[in-house]
Every structure is written in C-alpha cells, then in structure tokens.
Amino acid sequence: MTKNKNKIPKNFLTFEAILKKAKVEKKEIKDLTKIEGKRVANAIKKWAKTKGGVNYTHWFQSLSGRPSEKHDTIEYFSFDNLTQGEPDASSFPNGWLRDTFEARGYTSWDTTSPIFIKTYSGGYKVLCIPTILYSYNGHSLDNKLPLLRSQELINIQSIRLLQALGNVTSKSVVTCVGAEQEFFLIPLDILNKRPDIKLTGRSLFGQPSPRGQEGKDHYFGTMHGDVLKFMVEAENELKPIGVKIETKHNEVAPSQFEFAVRFSTGSIATDQNQLLMETLERVAERHGFACLLHEKPFAGLNGSGKHNNWSLQTDDGIQLFLPGKDKESMDRFLLFVCAVIRGAHKYAGLLRMSAANAGNAHRLGGHEAPPAIISVYLGRVISDLLQKVADSKEISFSKKKSMLDLGNAAVAQIDKHSTDRNRTSPLAFTSNKFEFRMVPSSISIAMVNTILNTIVAEGLDEFATRLIEAESVDSEISSIIKDTLEDHGSIVFNGDNY
C-alpha cells in the first residue's frame, strides 16, 4: 500500500485527542491528578517534537485585538508550563486594571480550543497553546475569557428554557459561529508608493478609480491566476491547523475578496478567524500583494466587513433557530427568536459598540449596507407566526414543501426558504441562524459573540423563570411572545434599510 503524498498533515490536537494520547480517561482538566498531568504534558511534548516544534507559546488574544505570544524552549516543557504562564500584565491594554508597577498576570490553558503547530518563515515551528489572560487579582485582560463565560451562561440558560418546555434529553447547548472575512489585495509595489495606505491601511488622498463596481461584474467573477494562487496557498497553510475554508470568491468591489471559514463553536471560531487574518497578511506578501483588512480602504468603493453567523445547537443535534414542524418545536423556535429580539432592542447600544471602530465609521451607512442603526430582520413568515401565537391563534403545520418550479425539465426544482435574505439588515434571520453584518473586518469576533451570547441569555433566563412558575405553559408561551412584541417589537424591521 503506497503512502498518500497528498495527505494533509494534522498539526492540531483537541483536548479529547490529547487525553487519548496520554491514555487518561478524565473529561476535564480540573480532574487530573499530578501523575496524569505529567502524562498529558509529555504526550503533547512528544507530539510537538514529531511535528518539528522547537518552542512553545501561550497563544492568547489580548485587548490589542491581535494574538500575543512569547516563545520558550520546548525542552523543559511540563504540566505547569502547559497550564499556566506569567506575562507582564501591565504592558498589555488593560483599562487601568493594572498600573505600571503591578506587573503580575497569568495565562491559563483554554481546553475548549485545539493546540496547534504554527510554522513561521524558514520552517521554524512553534507549539501554540490557546490560553486566556488575566491579572493577579483575577480580572480578565483579554477577549477570550469573557467569551468563554458568555458561552457557559447561554448554555445554562438555554438548558433551563428547554427543560421548562419539557426537554429532558438535551444536556448542553453550544454557540455555532461562522465568520466571513472580507479583504482587499493591492500590489506591494503600489503600496510602497503610497505612504498613506502603508501607514493607515487606507487611502487618504487621490482620484476616484476610473473603473469602480458599477458594472457589478467583479462579485463571484472568475478569480485571476495570481490571486487564485495566493488564495490556494493560504488555504493550504490553514488546513493543517484545523481551519477549514468553506468558500472563497471575488467580492463586490474591484480587488476585494472573501474567505468564509466552516462553522465551529464560538471560542474555536474566534481563534480560527485570528489565524485566518494573520495567514492572509503573511501569504499575500509572498505573492507580491498587500492584504488590506481596513474597513474602508478606498472612498467610493465598498468597504470590508466580517459577517458573523451565529446560532445555537444542543448536544443531541437540535438546531434551536430552525423553524419547527410541529407545535412543540415551533414554540421552542419562537421563544429563542424572542430572546434575540428582546436582547437586540434592550441592548442595541452594546451591539452597536461591539461593531464600533474608526474604520467602521467610514463604512457603515451612506451607500453601503448595513446602516449604523440596529434593527432585526425576521421576514414576513416568521413575523406572522410570532403575531399568531401572541394572539393565541392556531398555527397550521404543512408537511408539503414550498418548491420553486423554474419551468424547465432539465433544471431541478428547489426548496423555497421560509424567508428572503435581507442583505441591508444589521441583524438578519437567515433560515436557521442570525447574521450580524456590522462587524469590522479587522477586529476579533470575540466581543461581538460575547455580547450576543449575554444579551440573549438574559432573555432566556427570564422566559425560563416565567415558564417554570406558570400554571399553564402553553398560555405563558403566548404571553411571553405577546409581551416581547409589545415591549421590543419596534426593533424588527423587514424593509430596505437603505
């Protein structure tokens, strides 16, 4: 049997895979004994060395917005090195939680995200251990710890609501996140002639492009050879560390492109988006390009965003934002949608803040979607369903699918979705998820998802408490939906946001 030369090396390990290599049967790091911890560290060290790793680093996402790392020799790697590091906390952005003389900070291993081998120029390889950063007093100093806390919060409150609705099989709920990354490519020699772009990431002077996006021919157009070579190489660098590219294509503006990474849990998706941005910038240089992640590099052309597709799923496979086919599943779906409506209306300012930076101020609104005003798109069908339940009217469930007949026997009929896709809406329901379209192209998606998780979890908590205390669950479901529409329904806008 010949060895497959095209097989992609697997340069990442999940926590479960690490425990398996170490022959440890525990499920959580807190349950490990000292002997088991030593076996785990030795298994990681051995694996990293077989992959060519000569150093290790605690890889974390400080408030600077990009990953931070310090490389240490792997020869003295131990369980203590694995689980805890000690960087200078006062040297990172910290909102005055640390003064200059208060330097002690800690990093701790985030076992929800895989460890991976990162390859630098010249083939230099480093074992990267995803970690969180916090101060001597336990204050969070990074983007990851608040995200992990919010994921646990929405897990707890989702299960409370599901149990109040009679679900006894689901044990946990995870956030599923897929980020679409937009960017521009320009030749390096042009960048070197433009100090404004080189220093700020955007053009500050100049003339309008003689050919813009008026022809609408760049979007999904054929990718040119040099660009395609760059995109393929970037994808091939990402595959071994577990970043799976779902799609790549031309975007609307000339020289604008997009990568979309496959859905994963919120914390993993956050790490993978950071790795994607870093890889795009590094690989672009090899191909004679500069990758611009600025939100508005050129006046008169579309800017770049990062659509954050967000949903919830149980451990036994229930998609909580998938419209139901019977009363039980439809009640569940509508309550979770109501939690989003409530959160978006009550905390619109927080949502807007999570997508705010200087670059995005140039992009949002004007002649570019979405506007800078928060609204939620549900579509006519979902909006009508909510109103019917609020009015205690019966919903009819049809097993017959709505099909589109295109009038040609050679073309297959397709299922018609329950809603259109409103690309001008900041927060749009799209079949089985919500798409938050305001996110800046250059930032981490951690804060956005932290806020989404938290504001929705508060609504789930309130709904669960009401159902638990109610004499009639069915009547209370109608009351919750009615109250949500009366108190927060003004945030729903199904029209053209332009």
Locations of regions flagged by a protein language model:
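Glycine-rich, acidic/polar active-site loops that bind/position phosphate-bearing ligands
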Residues: 107-294, 298-498
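Active-site core of metal-dependent hydrolases
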Residues: 2-108
